[in-house]
From Swiss-Prot:
Native source organism of the sequence: Drosophila melanogaster
Record has Protein biosynthesis as a keyword: no
Database matches in HAMAP family: Ribosomal_uL11
Family listed: Belongs to the universal ribosomal protein uL11 family.
Keywords: Mitochondrion, Ribonucleoprotein, Ribosomal protein, RNA-mediated gene silencing, Transit peptide, Translation regulation
GO molecular function, one term: large ribosomal subunit rRNA binding
InterPro entries to which the protein is assigned, alphabetical: Ribosomal_uL11, Ribosomal_uL11_C, Ribosomal_uL11_C_sf, Ribosomal_uL11_N, Ribosomal_uL11_N_sf
Subunit annotation: Component of the mitochondrial ribosome large subunit (39S) which comprises a 16S rRNA and about 50 distinct proteins.
Subcellular location as annotated: Mitochondrion
The protein's name in its UniProt record: Large ribosomal subunit protein uL11m
């Protein structure tokens, strides 16, 4: 019995502890990783050196346009090191950039916030299909997925766009967005008056 107990103790000494931490999935603006919230506390909970991570991330994204949201997957190793995977910007970012708008619609399906051509859609699909989650998709599946995302943003996919007519549309859209912002601000102020 004592031999078995001795073998068990020696086995326990040789087995290394494995810590199972979940992957951290977050969007970080390119070149703007900082130790403050919300990124700092998330990294601190996983015992990652925050300053070293921010320096590493900013160095990796130095050639990108500053402020572009980048989906990141961070997996932490047991020795407090980490593996950082930086993906391409979200599809909504690309779609809004292609349409020339700042924000999508508040009521998808009822109003059109912008328009893009099939060529724009194909170029975005060619970029997004390189991301690890989308590698197994075909180009047709990727385009269909982007069309559904565009629909939820209020972006209409068309064959051709007349630049002059689209410029007028965007000017009208700016006025509509400004009016919606004013209405939202009035609702917020009315709520504050009721609770105060």
């Amino acid at each position: 019995m004592s031999k078995a107990a001795g073998k068990l103790k020696s086995l326990k000494k040789t087995v290394e502890r494995v810590t199972h931490t979940s992957k951290l999935k977050t969007n970080i603006p390119a070149g703007m990783a900082a130790a403050g919230p919300p990124l700092g506390p998330m990294l601190g909970q996983r015992a990652i050196n925050i300053a070293a991570f921010c320096k590493d991330f900013n160095a990796k994204t130095a050639e990108m346009k500053e402020g572009v949201p980048l989906p990141c997957r961070i997996s932490v190793n047991s020795d407090r090191s980490y593996d950082l995977a930086i993906h391409h910007p979200p599809a909504t970012f690309f779609l809004k950039q292609a349409a020339g708008i700042q924000r999508g619609t508040m009521t998808p399906g009822k109003e059109v916030a912008g328009m893009i051509t099939l060529k724009h859609l194909y170029e975005i699909a060619a970029i997004k299909i390189q991301d690890p989650p989308n590698v197994l998709l075909t180009m047709q599946q990727m385009c269909e997925m982007l069309i559904s995302i565009a629909r939820t943003c209020g972006i209409k996919v068309v064959r051709e766009i007349d630049p002059a007519a689209y410029g007028e549309f965007l000017e009208e859209r700016k006025l509509i967005v400004e009016q919606q912002r004013r209405e939202l601000q009035e609702k917020r102020e009315a709520k504050m008056l009721r609770t105060g």
